[in-house]
């Protein structure tokens, strides 16, 4: 196996990758939840929410790939099973089918949780001067902050 030399010490790479694994698990869990709500939303806002949830889960699917590939670029294996994601994720899963208003509130909390995960990634990557991970986490944080704001506005 080739030695990786990207200017980040191994201990830092592993620490950063561990924080990215949590971000990956949170993102995948929110992706699944958003897709579920897209399929099962009902009510007077059905069309708007159905389309908005579709936009969101498509964006999350791309993010999952970017995060996993960043983990791999640090020479660490990315988690890829529901069992691993369940252990790592802080995004709260729900039982049953919530109302459309509850769906919006649940997804808002999920996006806010991921903002916090992005901040944790930044705390690990900034001292190591890992600009690639910093950029990824900052970009993801911006998307999730904006999405949470838009979701909150739906239920006002």
Swiss-Prot record:
It is an enzyme of class 1 (oxidoreductase). One of its GO terms (molecular function) is oxidoreductase activity, acting on metal ions. Disruption phenotype: Very sensitive to H(2)O(2) but not methyl viologen in iron-replete conditions. In low iron conditions cells without mrgA survive 2.0 mM H(2)O(2) better. Cells grow at a much slower rate when transferred from 10 uM Fe medium to no iron medium. Cells have higher internal iron content than wild-type when grown in 10 uM Fe. Significant changes in transcript levels of 255 genes; about half are up and half are down-regulated. When combined with growth in iron-deficient medium 914 genes show differential expression. The keyword Oxidoreductase applies. Keywords: Oxidoreductase. CDD domains: DPS (cd01043). The keyword Oxidoreductase applies. Its EC number is 1.16.-.-. It comes from the Bacteria. It catalyses: 2 Fe(2+) + H2O2 + 2 H(+) = 2 Fe(3+) + 2 H2O. InterPro entries: DPS_DNA-bd, DPS_DNA-bd_CS, Ferritin-like, Ferritin-like_SF, Ferritin_DPS_dom. PANTHER family: DNA PROTECTION DURING STARVATION PROTEIN, GENERAL STRESS PROTEIN 20U. Plays a role in transport of intracellular iron from its storage (probably in bacterioferritin) to its subsequent use in cofactor synthesis. Belongs to the Dps family. This is Protein MrgA.
């Amino acid at each position: 196996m080739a030695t990786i030399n990207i200017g980040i010490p191994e201990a830092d790479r592993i620490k950063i990758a561990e924080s990215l694994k949590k971000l990956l698990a949170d993102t995948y869990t929110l992706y699944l939840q958003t897709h579920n709500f897209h399929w099962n939303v009902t009510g007077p806002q059905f069309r708007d929410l159905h389309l908005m949830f579709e936009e969101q889960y498509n964006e999350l699917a791309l993010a999952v790939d970017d995060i996993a590939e960043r983990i791999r670029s640090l020479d660490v294996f990315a988690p890829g099973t529901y069992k691993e994601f369940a252990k790592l994720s802080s995004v709260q899963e729900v039982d049953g089918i919530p109302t459309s208003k509850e769906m919006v509130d649940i997804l808002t909390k999920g996006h806010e949780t991921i903002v916090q995960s992005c901040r944790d990634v930044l705390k690990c990557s900034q001292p190591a001067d890992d600009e690639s991970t910093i950029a990824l986490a900052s970009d993801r944080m911006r998307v999730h902050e904006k999405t949470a704001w838009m979701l909150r506005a739906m239920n006002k």
